[in-house]
Amino acid sequence: MTQKFLICFPQGGINDMWSVMQQTINYCEREDRILVLDTTKNWFRDDWQAYFSILSPVVYKGVTPELITNLLKQDVFPSELQGKTHEELNHVIWVTEGHMSINGIHVSSPLHLSYKESVIVYAYCAMFRDIMQVFPKLQFTEEILTEFRRRRSMLPEKYISVHIRNTDNKSNVDEFIYNNRHILEKAPLFVASDNLNSIQRCKLEFNNVYSFSTIPDLGGENIHESSLSQKLRTTAEETRKWNSDAILDFLLLTQGEIILCSNYYSGFSMSAKRLQEAYSKNEIQPFY
């Protein structure tokens, strides 16, 4: 029997990408396909394999542009992408919620259906999906783990995690600080945010704030896909640091004694909160 494949281009932020990875792993397990993941056609603009691997028999190890080009020579759905090379595939475009396109071709076909073609091309942004299934399967690279340990060593043994989502999803930082002051002023704080002013506000308000990532002033624009954020990543090194900071902020948030979130519409916040609670109850094994 000829092996079938699903080529997936996960969209959205790191939490959304992990959610799509779990969604497509489940599909490939059910449909007996091999999952080929590519994160070079979205804001990440780098190979996910430089940051982590996924411990799953259906996830292809060692994905390359050449592999995808060769797969696209087979029987492909949607058929308009058959014969394309990886280089010819443009950046994925978000048309509307649940509708992504590549080269003007819809690539968010429903995954509750079966497809006869040998290769499916798929892109999606799985906002607010649960990552509790996929996260234990992630094995972070030594480079990520070394930097995580370095940053963790600079934090006190016990700290409170704070995540302020305040670009595309707005937060009332004044209200957040007012409502949580009785907690925030008593313990060391690790603060992660997509908004530079929010981090600076916490540092002005409290003298116990730790923050490591380089967050530029984007004027309230989306940290993932805005034109300004893309202009700030002109080299491979800048992209690698940008992506690593997002992952490392997430990992450090999960290790706090508690986690306070300013915006419950943020999937990044909610996933970090669920993992923090799971770690505090020893329900999952440490990633480090």
PLM feature segments, named:
Residues 2-186:
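Secretory-pathway glycan-assembly enzymes, especially type II membrane glycosyltransferases
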Residues 8-12, 238-239, 243:
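Active-site rim elements
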Residues 12, 22, 244-288:
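A donor-sugar binding/catalytic signature common to diverse glycosyltransferases
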Residues 17, 21, 197-200, 268-269:
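Short, well-ordered alpha-helical microsegments
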Residues 48-57, 199-208, 271-274:
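Short, aromatic/basic amphipathic alpha-helical patches
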Residues 164, 186-238:
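Catalytic donor nucleotide-activated moiety binding site of glycosyltransferases and closely related
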Residues 167-171, 197, 267:
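Short acidic, S/G/P-rich loop/turn micro-motifs used as interaction or catalytic elements
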Residues 184-189, 257-259:
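Short active-site oxyanion
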